[in-house]
UniProtKB/Swiss-Prot annotation:
PROSITE patterns: EF_HAND_2
Keyword Kinase: no
Family the entry assigns: Belongs to the calcineurin regulatory subunit family.
Function according to Swiss-Prot or TrEMBL: Acts as a calcium sensor. CBL proteins interact with CIPK serine-threonine protein kinases. Binds calcium ions. Binding of a CBL protein to the regulatory NAF domain of a CIPK protein lead to the activation of the kinase in a calcium-dependent manner. Mediates the activation of AKT1 by CIPK proteins (CIPK6, CIPK16, and CIPK23) in response to low potassium conditions and in the context of stomatal movement. Negatively regulates the enzyme activity of MTN1 in the presence of calcium.
Subcellular localization: Vacuole membrane
Effects seen without this gene: No visible phenotype when grown under normal conditions; due to partial redundancy with CLB2. Tolerant to low-K(+) stress. Clb2 and cbl3 double mutants show stunted growth, reduced fertility and necrotic lesions at leaf tips. They also have a reduced vacuolar H(+)-ATPase activity, are hypersensitive to excessive metal ions and are more tolerant to low-K(+) conditions.
Annotated InterPro entries: CNBL1-10, EF-hand-dom_pair, EF_hand_dom
Domain EF-hand residue range list: 36-81, 82-117, 119-154, 163-198
Listed name of the protein: Calcineurin B-like protein 3
GO molecular function, one term: kinase binding
Keyword Ribosomal protein in annotation: no
Amino acid sequence: MSQCIDGFKHVCSSFFRCFDIDIYKQSGGLGDPELLARETVFSVSEIEALYELFKKISSAVIDDGLINKEEFQLALFKTNKKESLFADRVFDLFDTKHNGILGFEEFARALSVFHPNAPIEDKIDFSFQLYDLKQQGFIERQEVKQMVVATLAESGMNLSDEIIESIIDKTFEEADTKHDGRIDKEEWRTLVLRHPSLLKNMTLQYLKDITTTFPSFVFHSQVEDT
């Protein structure tokens, strides 16, 4: 059991590690940084630093002050390939207005979840939504398999179908305490609290130091300095 849970931890770690890489005009541009600071865990100065990063990313392909999916994928995943379940899912969770683009407020609010000071419950909720592909309020076995396969593809890892199935079997054996073939939010919460390493890459330490680290870092080299 412990080996299989370790396997699931490794997959989750690879999943969230895509965030752990150099991460750092909607209409109205910056807007009200004090309001955003009150509604996120960022300070006003951190919001202002994030905005400088946002401007850089949003001008990588089309200089329109908004981040489209191609710019998002270039920045976050170092690829602009059209088919990527993993990238699509992350973008969809950032895109709370569901209009196919990210404004600065969406960008800042989503990254707030990854701040070291963000509440653990916010991190649990975000990670749960990543796997809840059908947005039904629970995670089915096939959803876990889809995301595991997508994550492995993004990270260049190769595991046999037998190993993947074994990881999923043992994960559900531990997490699905109601024995209904799915993992609801409370079961997910219990699982990740029992295995905190599942969430370790939901925290980006350098977001706490963004005012001193930006602009010395950017997502990837594709986002050129102007």
